[in-house]
């Protein structure tokens, strides 16, 4: 017998992982027969058991259709069914789990006078008898059974084994949960000792008489049996484990109505406390049945605090709901059935509680102590020398690494010095060229001669975008305004019919043209065109003279970038440094008056001079080549952008014109300068990217913007202009935020608080897309990769908060970019996003009716 029991225990310990599985609470319903009072009162029985799992309400006409008439559970018992059968069908297996090291609980729930105490007394007696029978049959293990009993009376905990009625305190134990302090715990000697203790508990428990029950329980009673088992002989570490678990027999007080129980005084107070604790228990059960959503208020009642491990924790649980079939108790019976319906949806996860025996622990500690003593007595010199050699090699590697870093820093210092010298020369050149520049004569929207401005490259500082809180964040974009009125057209617009309207500016976003890689590529492929950063406007003169366009070179000569455009739809907007505070925040300008610009001054050869102009501040002073294609349209003098581009392509395809143009704008000299400084571009790119990652985190930049930028610009020399512009933009934002200033985004004030709020809103949006873009297995792998517990709450929001949270970790940046790219479907958009990155992807600003009509009239010119 003992050998068989030992083998069974070994199998049980090996299958411990399988035992620790989720299972639902076992719910049994017992319908008692009518008692003598109900029979004398001619009460009708409205409830009956139609089979072993269903309870039916027969009087459906009285209640209507608001409630179901049938309820199904694990087992249902009629009034004539004995308690032994109720115990054998379900609670027996749950109770005997305690001898296998699994916690278990059995409790009765129902209204007053429904038979809870009667049922629990029988179940407790049968369960304890089976536990002792199991102990007597398994002599190869030593069992220790401890008994304790408490009651909760008016929210005060009393020890039923102690004559002292002093309330006991609850304390939180990290392993056992809520534990009662100083509760008496008796070690059982035999079966007779247990019966004596149960008799003491029945005598100590609070019992009162009401109109519904002569012996009504006025408190919740909890009887706890703790079973600890271990092998009688030390047969090795694997056979020396100790199992310890507990089983709780809980007899709850019944819910009652004061109007039916006719209670008053002390009985009324007792009923209030009973109903309040049962209400808290029902709330906890209902929340657990809904998948543990929201906060579960275990601490609202001492009953729920003690039962917390039994409700959805490390325990197997069985609930016996007792019902009264009388018609006068229909509402109370229905509430009990609703509680049972919620309870059967609650899941628990019980596991075997294994405790290492003291003998095995002592043996292990003795071996560890002997090993440490031997190491102290016999030190190994060879190992020490080996350790010294390893340490020296590590130091040498560190020295080599530091030498490489020193060489890299020296190289960066030399590059910075050379750039500083070039910048100083550039400043001197700008200062010397300011002598021939005209000044502003009148700050109005017209030139001095009354004609409308011919320049279309004027930057509106209020429309300069710094950070976008949408799904895509473009670079700083300056929108060019085209004013295309002559004096006659202006007078026509200011007719009496429009006298009350304010004059409007007609805007058009124009494409930006950049420099080609070389003149030879232009001659070989007629489809390629040069892109300048900003396309200037048209000539507003009525005689149709040839207009001129101005090409603006970026501010840093070393960041010049030449690209090839393979389609006419690939457009880029010019990037610019943020406007000065004097331009954006100047309060002395009257409302309605914008910037006024000086007369255009042309040099020899029809070249437009831009030295010391408002749009060239901080950039190189360059000259734009005059294009021989007429830019003035036939109707109203409106420039045709398409005809301008066609003329530009024809001009560039001419070797003589292209050479002249390259000579005028200084491309040959710039190529030599750029080729010398871009040799170490890969190292410079890594350094600048690290700075950008840090500035993104500091300025709370949009995650989608970070992902687009990180994936599009991967270190190509052609990406240098984007890297430089982004770095300058972020540096400006950081400086503004650190000084307490603000930036502007489409006419709105942007602060660090608003950026942080937009970032939080974006993270919540991305968390909602996790379930749509990733499968269950993919989400589980992502949670493990980002260090999120699989069983934790709000895992998707945790994942969104982890994205782009480590600016100094490039591996984390790569993983974050991959996740965000899939969430926003960046991969499906293709590489065309790189050509469009400088454009604003947000909806355009609303246009007025007159501006819309002007745009419709422009359609014929394109």
Curated annotation (Swiss-Prot):
Matches recorded under InterPro entries: Kinesin-like_fam (IPR027640), Kinesin_motor_CS (IPR019821), Kinesin_motor_dom (IPR001752), Kinesin_motor_dom_sf (IPR036961), NACK_C (IPR021881), P-loop_NTPase (IPR027417)
Binding positions for ATP per the UniProt entry: 110-117
Start and end residues of each Kinesin motor domain: 24-346
GO cellular component, as recorded: microtubule
Annotated keywords: ATP-binding, Coiled coil, Isopeptide bond, Microtubule, Motor protein, Nucleotide-binding, Ubl conjugation
One of the protein's GO biological processes: microtubule-based movement
Residue ranges that the Swiss-Prot or TrEMBL entry lists as coiled coil: 355-428
Stored Pfam families: DUF3490, Kinesin
Family annotation (SUPFAM superfamilies): P-loop containing nucleoside triphosphate hydrolases
GO MF, one annotated term: ATP binding
Comp. bias intervals (Polar residues): 465-476, 612-621
Disordered as annotated region, ranges: 463-505, 542-632
Crosslink position(s): Glycyl lysine isopeptide (Lys-Gly) (interchain with G-Cter in ubiquitin): 734
Record family assignment: Belongs to the TRAFAC class myosin-kinesin ATPase superfamily. Kinesin family. KIN-7 subfamily.
Protein name according to UniProt: Kinesin-like protein KIN-7E
Organism: Arabidopsis thaliana (Mouse-ear cress)
